[in-house]
């Protein structure tokens, strides 16, 4: 903790606030937290610290939407997601810090481009079983390597044309289960240790405050404007990671 400067703490604090907001009000905004954490900490270690905060945020989302879950979708995704997590774990164990940082940046830019393309195309086609396997695998890999599975799975759930509450409930349980599953991998890789937990402990209150603030802000901030801001900031951050 002594090695972190003031700017690093500011970036981590902002990232913690974004985590809380993304779980209770603004799905998809979590990619900005990925950028902030990977900028403030070594890229590989940043995934472990962010994971703990995501689980804290997941607890709020699970409690709020515990009665609206499409269990059939979750059962369909489980095996491809687990395969993606396994591949991502091997990659984290073999890749250098610079490689992980660049992969995080490339993944975020790719997801942003795909999101914008889907919006521009205005496609309403419901993803088939093969697409579900592909989204599940990529979601598992990206969530293990960069905690960036949110945009992938959000696109898939949106494509399934779920109503808002079912979407939020299904996503809440999905990410809570997946994030818990990733903890032993992070410990085994030596990324989640007591030093990282001591840093995260300082940030947990910010996640809690932002989670409650998210419920209050959700009906007051123009969704389109905020989503556009998140996309722009994430793109700038991802480019910074690639340079």
Language model region names:
Residues 212-233:
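Interfacial loop-to-transmembrane junctions
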Residues 1-3, 90-99, 186-198:
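Membrane-interface helix termini and inter-helical loops of multi-pass transporters
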Residues 46, 88-93, 101, 141-148, ...:
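Hydrophobic alpha-helical transmembrane segments in multi-pass integral membrane proteins
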Residues 9, 48-51, 105-108, 112, ...:
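Residues within membrane-spanning alpha-helices of integral membrane proteins
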Residues 8-75, 136, 140, 150-211:
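Small-residue-rich hydrophobic segments that form or flank transmembrane alpha-helices
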Residues 58-68, 89, 103-128, 215-216, ...:
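Transmembrane helix exit motif
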Residues 71-81, 103-107, 126-136, 166-173, ...:
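Cytoplasmic-side transmembrane-helix entry/capping segments in multi-pass membrane proteins
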Residues 35, 89-93, 155, 215-216:
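Small-residue-mediated transmembrane helix hinge/kink sites in multi-pass secondary transporters
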């Amino acid at each position: 903790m002594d090695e972190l400067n003031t700017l690093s703490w500011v970036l981590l604090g902002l990232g913690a606030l974004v985590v809380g907001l993304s779980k209770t009000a603004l799905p998809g905004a979590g990619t900005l937290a990925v950028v902030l954490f990977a900028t403030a900490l070594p890229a590989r270690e940043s995934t472990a610290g962010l994971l703990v905060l995501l689980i804290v945020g997941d607890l709020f989302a699970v409690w709020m939407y515990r009665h609206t879950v499409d269990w059939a979708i979750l059962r369909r995704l489980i095996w491809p997601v687990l395969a993606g997590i396994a591949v991502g774990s091997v990659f984290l164990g073999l890749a250098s810090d610079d490689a992980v940082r660049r992969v995080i940046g490339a993944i975020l830019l790719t997801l942003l481009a795909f999101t914008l393309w889907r919006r521009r195309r205005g496609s309403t086609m419901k993803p088939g079983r093969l697409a579900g396997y592909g989204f599940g695998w990529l979601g598992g890999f990206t969530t293990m390597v960069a905690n960036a599975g949110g945009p992938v799975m959000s696109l898939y759930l949106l494509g399934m044309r779920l109503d808002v509450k079912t979407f939020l409930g299904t996503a809440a349980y999905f990410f809570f289960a997946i994030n818990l599953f990733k903890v032993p991998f992070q410990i085994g890789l030596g990324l989640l240790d007591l030093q990282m937990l001591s840093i995260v402990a300082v940030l947990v209150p910010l996640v809690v405050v932002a989670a409650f603030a998210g419920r209050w802000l959700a009906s007051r901030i123009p969704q389109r404007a905020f989503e556009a801001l998140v996309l722009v900031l994430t793109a700038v951050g991802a480019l910074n990671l690639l340079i």
